[in-house]
Amino acid sequence: MAFILERAQAPQPASPATATLPVPTVQRLRRLNLAAAVFHLASAVLFLAIATDFDLPITASFPTEDPALTEQLFPAEVLTEVTIGYGVAAFSLLSALFHFLVATVANRPYNRAIAATQNPFRWIEYSLSSTLMIVLIVMLLGDYDIGALIGVAAANVAMILFGWLMERHNTPGADDVDWYPFVFGCIAGIAPWIVGTIYFAGALGNADEAVPTWVWALFISVFVMFNGFAVNQFLQYRRVGPWRSYVFGEGAYIALSFVAKTLLIWQVYFGTVR
């Protein structure tokens, strides 16, 4: 981990190692990260305190020659069950941990990275928390197959790593920005939503039961929020309006992360575990 952070914080030629942030900016970012840590922690603790147990299975299908299952060559077998409440609290706790780290013990390397228009801490946290989020989302939409869930997780991690690569190899506003990492990240990132859309559309096609309102809200709102991160990075590298400041984009990432996680937490609560 130390090697990864050291490499990630090494600035590119366009971002000199001597770059520093003004003291007011350092203080503002520290307060913002501390506030985010407190709110994420409070959300997780409150959720765990009031949520009831709600488990979903993780399944796998294996070929069989059981005569009793001649019409079902690949019956689904439950491997384990996941308590959704713990998963929901976990991604919020991960965010709280990373915000607390960059506001305290990792504050200096964080500030150096921000001055060099990079934030490796963000990408490491997202690779964990947002991946857990998207896996829980597709499970709530009805996908329990372990192979599909691993694919969803891998695609999301790839999206995050492409975002990190975009940041490592480019400088916002440069004439020679390489957009390939951004485009590849978008392609990888849409895969989990294709899986989710298949299950959501399948639920819509079920004439016997109406899709619960909370599922509509969950699918649409979190999809919009996830795409907000890509829009934020695009605006950073196009240097549009206030995004001319990398620090503004960093603040937008923090706000987007908090809103997306808060939406998911409470939509899950009102839809399933209350």
Descriptions of predicted regions:
Residues 3-38, 42-120, 131-274:
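Polytopic alpha-helical membrane-helix bundles and their juxtamembrane interface segments
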Residues 122-125:
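Right-handed parallel beta-helix
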